């Protein structure tokens, strides 16, 4: 069973379980998660993080359908809208429109670092090295920046020939930078590996089956060789622009701005197509394996805490909803356990 979650321009998060064997999709939840358009999602284990133009981050346990944290960005950051974020082993990283990076400790959601740069044009993409000791970012100022994640400091700044949109590590020794019309691959010493240009605008990229997957404005998906950038395969995935591409298990999931989500096998055959409710334009997507038997650690203690909190809430409020009711009708999570700056 696969699970994908999309964020929309209309402030909504929509979660769906996809049964590959039966080729059926089961909607799990559709709710208003933020006060602005969703700009990024990130997933790691049980944690699902969402952010939007309202400059907040919310953390959900997607295995139990409950919000577990409401993380605010540092109060001294102006223009704090987040364009990209990702998890590492111990942290959640978020990139802001003012060129800064915030780091929170995973689990406690306490702010541990604010990495600052001289740029005020915004970071649009971040890639963390497999060692998790350094990160690379790109942004609206057309520069590549190196960050030391161990010491929490910025490093080298290098100008690029294009305005980049996204960045991705291919392995420990190479990475790719995507702009609207092309892709450039480099080694860590900045030796060029290959360059690829496209007539149609590029919107999304990921690694899948050791190949580079690129989603384009014309609805097509390109499969590129990571060694030389040559096109290995090309197929039409959607009628309109491909907004997101995401690998999970042996499958590739693509999402279009028109609200359609498609699951493809390793031979590029369409397995399942699902459409989110009409009028909700997709802005971002993540996917994961959905294991009905998986539970977070200390689940009994957490369940007891949640029951206690629910009891306290029922004593002070005349309105009460179960978690299942919330995920079909409510706009706010049933439980907000922590809030950190």
Swiss-Prot record:
Any one GO CC term of the record: nucleolus
* Name of this chain's protein: Shk1 kinase-binding protein 15
Which residue stretches belong to region Disordered?
293-341
UniProt keywords, alphabetically: Repeat, WD repeat
Q: Which SMART domains match?
A: PQQ, WD40
Q: Which domain of life is it from?
A: Eukaryota
**Which regions does the record annotate with the repeat WD?**
33-70, 77-114, 119-157, 197-234, 237-274
Q: What is the role of the protein in this entry?
A: Negatively regulates pak1/shk1 kinase activity leading to proper execution of cytoskeletal remodeling and cytokinetic functions. Interacts with pak1/shk1.
The molecular function terms of the Gene Ontology recorded here are: protein kinase inhibitor activity
Pfam (any one): WD40
User: InterPro entries per the record?
Assistant: PAK1-Kinase_Regulator (IPR051959), PQQ_b-propeller_rpt (IPR018391), WD40/YVTN_repeat-like_dom_sf (IPR015943), WD40_repeat_CS (IPR019775), WD40_repeat_dom_sf (IPR036322), WD40_rpt (IPR001680)
* Entry's Gene Ontology BP terms: maturation of LSU-rRNA from tricistronic rRNA transcript (SSU-rRNA, 5.8S rRNA, LSU-rRNA); regulation of actin cytoskeleton organization; regulation of microtubule cytoskeleton organization; ribosome biogenesis; signaling
Presence of keyword Repeat: yes
**What Gene3D superfamilies does the record tag this protein with?**
YVTN repeat-like/Quinoprotein amine dehydrogenase (2.130.10.10)
Has UniProt tagged this entry with the keyword Repeat? yes
Composition bias (Basic and acidic residues) maps to 297-309
């Amino acid at each position: 069973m696969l699970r994908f979650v999309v964020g929309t321009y209309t402030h909504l998060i929509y979660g769906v379980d996809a049964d590959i064997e039966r080729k059926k999709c089961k909607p799990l939840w559709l709710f208003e998660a933020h006060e602005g358009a969703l700009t990024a999602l990130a997933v790691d284990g049980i944690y699902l993080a969402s952010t939007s133009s309202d400059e907040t981050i919310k953390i959900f346990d997607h295995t139990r359908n409950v919000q577990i944290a409401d993380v605010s960005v540092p109060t001294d950051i102006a223009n704090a809208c987040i364009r990209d974020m990702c998890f590492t082993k111990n942290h959640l990283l978020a990139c802001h429109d003012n060129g800064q990076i915030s780091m929170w400790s995973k689990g406690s959601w306490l702010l541990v670092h604010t990495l600052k740069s001289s740029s005020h044009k915004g970071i649009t993409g971040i890639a963390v090295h497999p060692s998790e000791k350094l990160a690379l970012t790109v942004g609206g100022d057309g520069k590549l920046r190196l960050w030391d994640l161990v010491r929490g400091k910025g490093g080298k700044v290098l100008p690029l020939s294009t305005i980049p949109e996204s960045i991705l590590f291919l392995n420990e020794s190479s990475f790719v930078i995507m702009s609207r019309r092309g892709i450039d691959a480099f080694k860590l010493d900045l030796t060029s590996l290959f360059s690829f240009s496209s007539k149609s605008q590029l919107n999304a990229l990921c690694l899948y089956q050791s190949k580079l997957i690129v989603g384009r404005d014309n609805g097509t998906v390109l499969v590129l060789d990571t060694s030389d950038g040559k096109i290995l395969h090309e197929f039409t995935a959607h009628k309109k622009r491909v907004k997101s591409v995401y690998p999970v298990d042996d499958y590739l999931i693509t999402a279009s701005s028109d609200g359609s989500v498609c699951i493809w096998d390793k031979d590029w055959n369409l397995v399942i197509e699902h459409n989110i409710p009409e009028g909700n334009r997709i802005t971002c997507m993540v996917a994961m394996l959905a294991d009905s038997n998986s539970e977070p650690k200390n689940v009994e203690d957490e369940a007891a805490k949640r029951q206690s909190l629910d009891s306290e809430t029922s004593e002070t409020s005349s309105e009460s909803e179960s978690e299942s009711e919330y995920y079909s009708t409510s706009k706010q999570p049933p439980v907000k356990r922590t809030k950190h700056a």
